[in-house]
Design a protein with these regions (language model features):
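A glycine/serine/threonine-rich, flexible loop-to-helix segment
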Residues: 56, 63-90, 100, 131-142
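Generic structural signal for alpha-helix termini and adjacent loop/cap motifs
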Residues: 7, 110-114, 132
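Catalytic loop of short-chain dehydrogenase/reductase
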Residues: 9-55, 66-70, 94
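C-terminal helical subdomain
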Residues: 63, 81-116, 121-125
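Short glycine-/acidic-enriched loop or helix-start segments at secondary-structure transitions
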Residues: 29-30, 119, 132-133
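Residues immediately C-terminal
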Residues: 128
Length: 142
C-alpha cells in the first residue's frame, strides 16, 4: 500500500502514516501465532518505508503498539480477554482503551510530532516496561 501511495504521490509532503501493532511482534504471547509474525513485518515495513518515504517527501511512518484492546479482530484470539485483564493489572496506568488509542493517533497525525518517524511507540499504560508487579505476584502465589 505504501509503495503504491509513493508511486501515485498520494500522501502530502510532511504527511503521516500510523499503523497499529502489538507487543507480540517482539515477545512471545501464547495463541497470538501468525498475527505476531504479521505485526513484526508491519514494524519492519514502517522502518523501511519511513526511510524511503521520509527522504522523498518527509512523510512520517510510525506504528503504535497498543494495549490489549477489545476489538473485532481480537475476539478471534483465544484467551484475549484474560490477556487484556492481565495486562491491565500489570500496567501502572492501566490499559489504554480504543478511545485513548484514537487520541494518540490524532497526536501522531499532528504537526506536534513532525520529527517522529520510523518508530514503534508503545501505548500500553507501561505494560511493555514492567517485569512483574507486586499485585500480580500476590495473585499468582495466593
Amino acid at each position: 500500500m505504501l509503495s503504491v501511495a509513493k508511486r501515485l504521490d498520494a500522501i502530502s509532503e510532511w504527511g503521516s502514516v500510523v499503523a497499529l501493532t502489538y507487543i507480540a511482534a517482539q515477545r512471545s504471547f501464547v495463541d497470538y501465532s501468525d498475527m505476531a509474525d504479521a505485526k513484526a513485518m508491519l514494524e519492519s515495513i514502517t522502518r523501511s518505508f519511513g526511510l524511503i518515504y521520509g527522504e522523498a517527501r518527509h512523510v512520517r511512518i510510525n506504528t503504535i503498539s497498543q494495549s490489549p484492546t477489545a476489538t473485532t479482530a481480537g475476539e478471534g484470539i483465544e484467551g484475549m480477554e484474560q490477556l487484556r485483564l492481565f495486562a491491565d493489572r500489570m500496567s501502572p496506568l492501566g490499559n489504554a482503551d480504543a478511545d485513548d488509542c484514537a487520541d494518540y493517533c490524532v497526536a501522531l497525525f499532528s504537526d506536534l510530532t513532525r520529527k517522529v518517524t520510523m518508530q514503534n511507540l508503545y501505548h500500553d499504560g507501561g505494560f511493555s516496561s514492567v517485569g512483574i508487579t507486586g499485585s500480580a505476584l500476590e495473585q499468582i502465589f495466593s
